[in-house]
Structures are given as C-alpha cells and as structure tokens.
Amino acid sequence: MKIAVYGKGGIGKSTTSCNTSIASARRGKRVLQIGCDPKHDSTFTLTGSLIPTIIDTSQSKDYHYEDVWPEDVIYKGYGGVDCVEVGGPPAGAGCGGYVVGETVKLLKELNAFYEYDIILFDVSGDVVCGGFVVLLNYADYCIIITDNGFDALFAVNCIAASVREKARTHSLRLAGSVGNRTSKRDLINRYVEACPMPVLEVSLLIEDIRVSRVKGKTSFEMVEFQPFLNYVCEFYLNIADQILSQPEGVIPKEIPDRELFSLLSDFYLNPTNNERENKNQETLLDFMII
C-alpha cells in the first residue's frame, strides 16, 4: 500500500508521517518512508539526523546509478522504519518534482519499491505542480494534513482537486484528512460538510507534539522516557489502523475558490451564527446521550 501525505507547508506533515509510519510498524508492517522535500528533513525524527539524500548519493557515484545499492540510499530508522530522503536541486535551479520521479524509478530498479507493506511519501508543502503531484500516480491513498485555519483548508481544497484529477486515470482515493494540533475543529467540520471526506483523526493542541519535533524524536520514542505521553501515540495508532483496514476512501469534489472563500470567511465574519449552530449541536448531543 502506498500513501501520499500532503498539506500546507509547516502544517505537520513530517511529524504525522513519522509517527504514523512507526504506528504501522507497531502493527507488524514493513514500512518505508520517503521524504519528498528538498529540505530533506522528513525522516529527521526517525533517524535522529539528516541522512544523505538520493541527490547526495548520485553525486558521489558520478550519477552511475548502476553503482548504487539499496544500502546506499535506504537507512534504518526508529521502530524498524526504513527511510529515504530524496533531496532536491539547489534553490532556484531544476525541478524538485522531477527528482522525486527519478527516485521512484531508482527504487524500482533496486527492487526495493515492492518489498514493503507500506510506503509513505511525505510530500513538500501544498504544491500542486505536476512534478510533485506525479506522486499521486503511484499512491493508493492520499492523506491531507490540516488544522482549523483558513489557509490550511484552502490548501486542502487545492489538493483535493489534484486527487480528483488523478483519480480519473489511477486507482487513487482520498483516505481522509487529519487535523493536527488544533484546539477546535469547527471550521474543519464546516469544510467537510461542503466537500465530503473522512476526518481520520484530530490531535489536540499538545505542546509535546511540537517539542518532539524539536528534540528530533517521535512521540513513540519520547514515551519511553515520559510514559504519560502514551495518549499522544494513540492518535497515530488510530490513523494507522484506519489506513491498514484499506478504507473505501472518496474521490473528493473540491469547492470553487469563490465559494470556498465565502464559506470560510463567513465563519469569521458571522461568529454569532456559528455559536448558535454549535449550541444546537450540543443540545442535540445532550438529547442523544439521554
């Protein structure tokens, strides 16, 4: 199973990817995480360092790919997760998306692409150019990371459009969205009502999640020394369980930009209406509990 993780830049894709990779490994799966960002820091919390990239290795071999072996580009990370970093060309030169495509070709030539139960692509930012979106050609599922904010949900909508387009010719489905480090989910709820998609999980605004990234450790590694953080790991185990169940997924129908702008901006411009809706929902829940 191949999963592509997208989302707005800085939204927490790498944090979510690393922890979900470990959660999948904890379920007995063999996992490969491929960092598809020129910053090459996707697997930092898995390996504890910035591992050499495909670009670095290729340069050291004078671009003789026949001299590249799996152990030259695949590094063992925490929890038994294997890691690859694609890297990218210098800033302002070349196409990072092209390098990603070449990485997939190289892994296929090394017979490494088909040896895993789960391959997770952690993709750069919210880009929708053909170079990075080409990863959707290889994916069975896409997961979009968001928060309860205006900009992040705009990115979700743009990525949803890319998924719909690729699903025309590939057996690709949107597994769902993941809310990351957000104290509320009311704006997420409003969006998924207008553009139906599953919400796999919403992690709370937990400082320990941010700190784990700074420390270069996953939540699963931190819990070995801070057992009270075990509840954080449950978020990622839940995501992994849903993915491993091979969900039906959806082909999303994105919202036209102007309609989306009105939908999301109205949420901020008319807070009274939103509070009334929330109270109605709470009242309904009270009756349901009774």
UniProtKB/Swiss-Prot annotation:
Its cofactor is [4Fe-4S] cluster. It is found in: Plastid, Chloroplast. It catalyses: chlorophyllide a + oxidized 2[4Fe-4S]-[ferredoxin] + 2 ADP + 2 phosphate = protochlorophyllide a + reduced 2[4Fe-4S]-[ferredoxin] + 2 ATP + 2 H2O. One of its GO terms (cellular component) is chloroplast. It is an enzyme of class 1 (oxidoreductase). Gene3D superfamilies: P-loop containing nucleotide triphosphate hydrolases. Pathway: Porphyrin-containing compound metabolism; chlorophyll biosynthesis (light-independent). Its EC number is 1.3.7.7. Keywords: 4Fe-4S, ATP-binding, Chlorophyll biosynthesis, Chloroplast, Iron, Iron-sulfur, Magnesium, Metal-binding, Nucleotide-binding, Oxidoreductase, Photosynthesis, Plastid. Component of the dark-operative protochlorophyllide reductase (DPOR) that uses Mg-ATP and reduced ferredoxin to reduce ring D of protochlorophyllide (Pchlide) to form chlorophyllide a (Chlide). This reaction is light-independent. The L component serves as a unique electron donor to the NB-component of the complex, and binds Mg-ATP. Homodimer. Protochlorophyllide reductase is composed of three subunits; ChlL, ChlN and ChlB. This is Light-independent protochlorophyllide reductase iron-sulfur ATP-binding protein.
